[in-house]
Structure formats: C-alpha cells, structure tokens
Amino acid sequence: MKRIQTFLLTLLLLTSCLSRVSTPEPTPTTAPVYTGTPTPFQPPTETVTPVVAQEPTATPLPRPARALILSIDGFRPDAIELTPMRNLGALMDEGAYSLVAQTIFPSSTLPSHSSMLTGLCPDKHGVNWNDYIPNKGYASGIDIFDLAHTAGLRTVMVVGKEKLRQVTEPESTDVFEFINDRDLVIAARVVELIPQGFDLMLVHFPTPDWMGHKYGWLSPEQYSVLFRADEALQIILNALEGAGMRDDTLIIITADHGGHNTTHGSRRLEDMTIPWIIAGPGVKHMVLSTDINTTDTAATVAWALGLPIQPDWDGRPVLEAFGLPDEPHIQPRCP
C-alpha cells in the first residue's frame, strides 16, 4: 500500500513540474519613469492614463538548502537548565524553541520516531511496538523521507538503535547506518558523511536514554552523557561550517520522549514533554508560544524544503518560528 502511495506521489510531482514548464510567463510591464521635467499642457480631447503605483512586495523568506534533524533519545527539556550544554544553548539563542513540546503516547522510542517522521499519530502509522521486529514491517503512511527521496533529494539516517530501521523503508534512504555506540562515535561518522552531501538527514543520539534506564532520569550519570551529547553536536556543527553548509542548513533538535525514575512510556508530563529547537535560514529568535507536537517536525521540514504536506498528516508546520501566522490544526491532536 505504501509503495502505491509513493508511486502516486511521484506522478503528482511530475505533473506539477510539467504544468509549470508548459505555462508561459507573462511579459512584465514597465511603469514610465518620472524624469523631473514638467508635463506640458494636454488638450482636453486627449486622454491621460493614470499610472497606478504598485504595492510593495514582501521579501521572500530564505529557503534552506537542506535539513538536519537531531533526535536526542530520552532528553527531558528541564535537563537543559541543569546541564552545561553550551552548543545547544547557542542554537537556542540563535533560533526559536519550545521547552514544553509534546510527544505521543506511548512515549517510547519507535512509536515516537514514527510519529516524528510520518507526521501521523500512532493510530494511523500503526507502530505500537518498541523493539526491532523486522516481520512487523514499517510505519504506514508517507513519511518525510519518502517525500524527500521521491523528489530526488539525498536522504541519510545515522542512528544508535536498530529498531529505527522500521520507521521508513530502505528504498527511502540513500544512506542508512546503525551504529551501536556512544553519541561521539555517531557524530564522528556523521562528520565523514557530511562532505558527501545531503538534503535530509536524521541523526539519533541514544546514550542519554541508556543512562536514564540504568541510573535514572536527571541523574548525575545522565547529566554527564548530555554534556557529551552537546560536544557531539559541536562536532557536527563544526563539520557543517567546514563544508560551507552551516548557514543554509535548517536544524531541528528534539527528543522522542522524556522519562522518570528509570523508565518512560506513560502519559506523565516527565515522559511526554520534550524540547523542540529550530535554527537556520528564515528562523526568527523567539520562545515559541505555539502548541507543538512531535508530529509537527515532519510537516515543518516538508514546508521548509518545499515538499507537499500530506492531507492526512496530524502535524502542521510551525510557521511561528519563521515569523508567520500559524495554520490551525485540521486534524485533532493525537489521543
């Protein structure tokens, strides 16, 4: 079913491109230029056509050349105030953010990442398991990687948990790498991939979740690995800068869920509340007042890259981050 949806999406994109090619652009008219010379008297039998002043056009927003989503597994937003995360803080100062965004229920890694990238609530994408179970297949619906790959964009995923293979089909990623290691090791691999180019990349840091399960959320041990995650972020930002890609890359940093004690998955605020930070071309500096859900991540990336937002998506683009009026939610929030 999902392959049929992707095929129809390809036909839609091709039809849109052909219609744009076949329609000739109108020839612009040039208003007469005032030279400062007095206009001679015109006989009353001649008609003078008034020149209508044109309304000033709004400056178009700069569009990013690419988008990078960094998901920090198990990252509670209240940890930001308790952990020295200088690089994350710099992005917050540069861009827009919310520290009260919400994930979906169940607040677990695989269902949440599926909602993050498909823009759908769990009852639509169907991922209700949280382990790597290949025979269960993939999340249903057209996800952001399907859209990007169908449009001819280069798509990359570098993740620290193998179960994230089940978010999207293999043919929707040009590069998929599972690295069962620390965040700094994952970042080092991302640095090697950046010069090869990408249009859409997901990077997943697993270590904060591991430490939360072992030592507890907001434990000293988790603070320590969040500090390392910030160092890993710096490595990626430096690589983008070195490749001349930093200024035209849209960056979203978020999480799949939070946690309490040594667990998560419930509807408790500690489990459901996540950070949502965005920086890059066109993004204004502000604390976002918009009600943000993890499903909005896919819609925001699609909007920024000029990809078609799917009508059945529950998420919508966070336009407030770009200084624009937010669109109302057509779909209700996830139950």
Task: Give a label for each model feature.
Residues 113, 117, 267-308, 319, ...:
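Substrate-binding rim/cap in mid-to-C-terminal beta-strand-loop elements of soluble/periplasmic
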Residues 63-64, 74-196, 303, 316-321:
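Active-site-proximal alpha/beta segments of enzymes that process anionic O-linked groups
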Residues 163-173, 195-231, 235:
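Active-site His/acidic residue clusters
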